[in-house]
Amino acid sequence: KKLKNTQSLIVSSLKQETLNSVVISFEIPPNFKKQYAFKAGQYLTLSANIKGEQIKRSYSICSSPKSQNLQVGVKAIENGVFSNYVNDALRQGDSIDVTIPEGRFVLENSASANYCAFVAGSGITPLMSIIPDVLENNENGVFVLGYGNKTKASTMFSSTIDELKSKYTNRFFCYNIYSQ
């Protein structure tokens, strides 16, 4: 049974983000662009038939609303049926059921707002939508991020964060904390 407000979307690309995580990009048909418009911080629920069982999981959107891309980051977890399916079996060109964006983890951006966030591991995914959105829409805003991971190699979105630090030199600061 299909979830409410769901369309079958084509995976336009799968990017290996770290050894055990991928970023999925979805192709949005022109007639569904409006339904799949999103606010930074929202999430999607993906649904797939895995070994005869319909499994669904929610993942935060990790692309900026201005980017015109709809992407989620998925980290494989031990015994995670859906996350391992996505990381090991899902391919570019495959179709997967995706709900329209939902959720209220969104910022009401104000012209003078400064932000600070602390995240660990794959908890970074909604912020990969929120941070660029804040910096693009608030020319005076500052965003400070404390980001915990096991190792540099296991850090999701490391290169994107480096690009943001270069682009917004005096406005975006990321402090990485490694446990190993």
Name each model feature, range by range.
Residues 2-95, 113, 149-151, 162, ...:
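Ferredoxin-reductase
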Residues 84-180:
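FNR/FR-type flavoprotein reductase catalytic core
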